[in-house]
Amino acid sequence: MTGTVFFGLRPSTFGCIVVLPTAASVALLMSLLSRHFCAALLALFAATASGGLALAAEILSCAQFTHEGAPQPMARGDQRGLERLDRINQAVKNTPYSALFLGDSLTEGWDPVLWERSLAPRGVLNAGIAGDFTDHILWRLEHGNLAGPPAKAVILLIGTNDLAAHRSPELTADGIRAILVLLRERLPDARILLLGLLPREQSPDARLRRAVAQVNRLIRDCADGEHIVYAEIGDVLLDSDGRLSVAVSPDWLHFSERGYAVLASSLEPVLDRLVAGASSCQLR
């Protein structure tokens, strides 16, 4: 029986295979084990991948918008951005707040008098950094912006700098989506107010204005009305012809005191409903 492989239980069994100790039988056994191991490993990888996709689908109601891979966190390389990051990180640990307003210069540059009048009383902390892309938000969420007590609500307004850097609307939307996934993972009990990108450039037919509209059409599908609420508050900035006037936006990107006053009047009721719905987990 030299070199024969038996299937059955014996004192020297490995599973249900008995191998007589010859070079040929050992080689055959190793071949069988290798094939079974590879098959099992492939099955494990498939299960893990599908589980990851299922988890992402459970967290958000929108799928990824491109096939370019998930955006990666990126640190700011300039001194001003890093100093502003440090101030925000200190504020989240030392300043009482209930809502974190993440954004770029449109958030950081919010008229301070109007902020103190309308947003500060609602417990909103300004976490905007001028020049930020979606990648930068991802990075700072993992480097101190969430180091304080968990926020009850998060307001997110980001993406216009991505578009200005000639990123596609789809890739910009993927960056926003990645932020939402991270926020849902890190702050599962918080409600997120996802703001549509605000209009820029004077004409409704301008390239970046159209790109803003494309991004908004994509990201609105990421809202479920419960954990993530979507709102477009920028239309109030436009005149009857859809144009952005210098009175509300002198450079057709950033806003004047009048522009921020108009935005605040549009944001306040949305924010109030969001916070009021935090206990019932339903915004109506």
Residue ranges: model-predicted function:
Residues 4, 14-101, 106-113, 117, ...:
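N-terminal secretory targeting modules
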Residues 9-12:
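Intrinsically disordered, low-complexity proline-rich regions
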Residues 86-100, 139-147, 181-184:
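Short amphipathic alpha-helices and their capping/turn segments at secondary-structure boundaries
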Residues 101, 132, 136, 167, ...:
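Extracytoplasmic/secreted proteins, especially bacterial periplasmic and envelope-associated proteins
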Residues 108-120, 134-177, 182, 193, ...:
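Oxyanion-hole/transition-state-stabilizing segment in secreted/luminal serine hydrolases
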Residues 123-132:
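A short beta-strand-loop structural module common to alpha/beta enzyme folds
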Residues 187-190:
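A short helix->loop->beta-strand "cap" motif at the edges of active sites that frequently abuts
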Residues 199-284:
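Catalytic His-Asp segment of secreted/periplasmic serine-dependent ester chemistry enzymes
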